[in-house]
Structure formats: structure tokens, C-alpha cells
Amino acid sequence: MKLILLGAPGAGKGTQAQFICQKFGIPQISTGDMLRAAVKAGTPLGLEAKKVMDAGGLVSDDIIIGLVKERIAQADCANGFLFDGFPRTIPQAEAMKAAGVNLDFVVEIDVPDSAIVERMSGRRVHVASGRTYHVKFNPPKVAGKDDETGEDLIQRADDNEETVLKRLAVYHEQTEVLVGYYSNMAASGDKTAPTYVKIPGVGSVDGIRDAIFRALGA
């Protein structure tokens, strides 16, 4: 089972990725983890990536694709893998295809922007313990206070509405085009095309999980 999960920040990809990886016995692979592991191991690609990062640059798609090929050749990928946050752009998707990295499924978790803003801007955190709340979906017993300690809850900078809207704008501009790329590829009759699946991401976590499993034939 080789697949990628697409969806805006806050769509619930992280939660669903864990369910999928447990169900199919596959690793979740993120470019960040790959880069850190390669740099730590001192591989040729890792050293190349480190040079770029130390200079404050963006690691090229060529290096990323090289790392992907190295990573998926490892033993834990024998049954497949789930790409998290990769590919992000059409050039990356095309480079991956050219490198012979084929996928079985592309799963898009589709959540309206308004629901994502509500989800993320309503989050509140107790910094010391890491306990999280939501003003609507999981409110503390006393507004703005941690249930255990009574200490103040905060809204992380990442979760304020303005920041969420900016991140959504970047997603729509850069990554959402992949939705069209993969759905067109699937419709074109290309034999290497992955099956493209769109799952509504509003509802219970378990309901969304079950819909994804059905789509993946599990």
C-alpha cells in the first residue's frame, strides 16, 4: 500500500495517517524526518542537504527525490509507505514519477476553509502540561482555564485566525494543484496512475477513518 495524503493544514491528516499506518503496517514518511535522518547519518545526500540548509537555502527537489528513493528501499517499506507532506508541488510529483516511484492511492481529506478556521482558531493549550482544549468541541470546565490546575490557557500563534488563513492561502496556491494533477492522471488511463480518492473530512474521526479504509479496500 503506497499512498499520499493530501489536505489543507488542520484537515486531520496526522490523525488519519496514524490509523492508516497501523492498519497496513507501513511507515509514515515525512521529508523533514528524512532530511534529519540523512544529515545525522552523514550520507552523501545528507551532507549535500546540510550544506544547503546551513547556508539558509531550500533543499532542491533532486536531493529530496534522492532521499525518497533511499528511504523507500529500506526494509520497513516492504509493504508500502505513506508520504506525509510530500510531494508538495507538481514538479516534485513529476520528478517522483520520472524516478519510478509509483503510488497506489492518493487520498484527499476535503474540509472547507471555514471549518478549518473554526477548528484551529478555537484551540487552546495549557503550556506546562501540553493539555489541549477547544472552545467549542472540547471546552475546559471554566473558560480559559486548565481543568487540572486552573492555570490560564493560551492560543498558540500558529492557531490565530490570521495565521490559519495565510497557511490556507499557501496550500491553495501550491499544493491544491496536486489534487487536479492526480485526478487528471487517474482519468487519463495512465497505467501507473494511482487511484484518486476524495474523502469529506467533516464529521467524527472514526467515521472519516472508516470511509478512508473502505476507499482503500480494507
Swiss-Prot record:
GO process terms (BP): AMP salvage
EC number, as in UniProt: 2.7.4.3
A Pfam family hit: ADK_lid
Positions of the UniProt region annotated as LID: 122-159
Keyword field: ATP-binding, Cytoplasm, Kinase, Nucleotide biosynthesis, Nucleotide-binding, Transferase
UniProt enzyme class: transferase
Catalytic activity: AMP + ATP = 2 ADP
Superkingdom to which the source organism belongs: Bacteria
Signal peptide from the UniProt entry: none
Pathway assignment: Purine metabolism; AMP biosynthesis via salvage pathway; AMP from ADP: step 1/1
Localization per record: Cytoplasm
Residues annotated to bind ATP: 10-15, 123, 132-133, 203
Residues binding AMP: 31, 36, 57-59, 85-88, 92, 156, 167
Cellular component, GO, one term: cytoplasm
Annotated region (NMP), positions in chain: 30-59
Gene Ontology molecular functions: adenylate kinase activity; ATP binding
NCBIfam families: adk, PRK00279.1-1, PRK00279.1-2, PRK00279.1-3, PRK14527.1
Subunit structure, as described in the record: Monomer.
Swiss-Prot/TrEMBL domain comment: Consists of three domains, a large central CORE domain and two small peripheral domains, NMPbind and LID, which undergo movements during catalysis. The LID domain closes over the site of phosphoryl transfer upon ATP binding. Assembling and dissambling the active center during each catalytic cycle provides an effective means to prevent ATP hydrolysis.
Function according to Swiss-Prot or TrEMBL: Catalyzes the reversible transfer of the terminal phosphate group between ATP and AMP. Plays an important role in cellular energy homeostasis and in adenine nucleotide metabolism.
Name of this chain's protein: Adenylate kinase
Gene field: adk
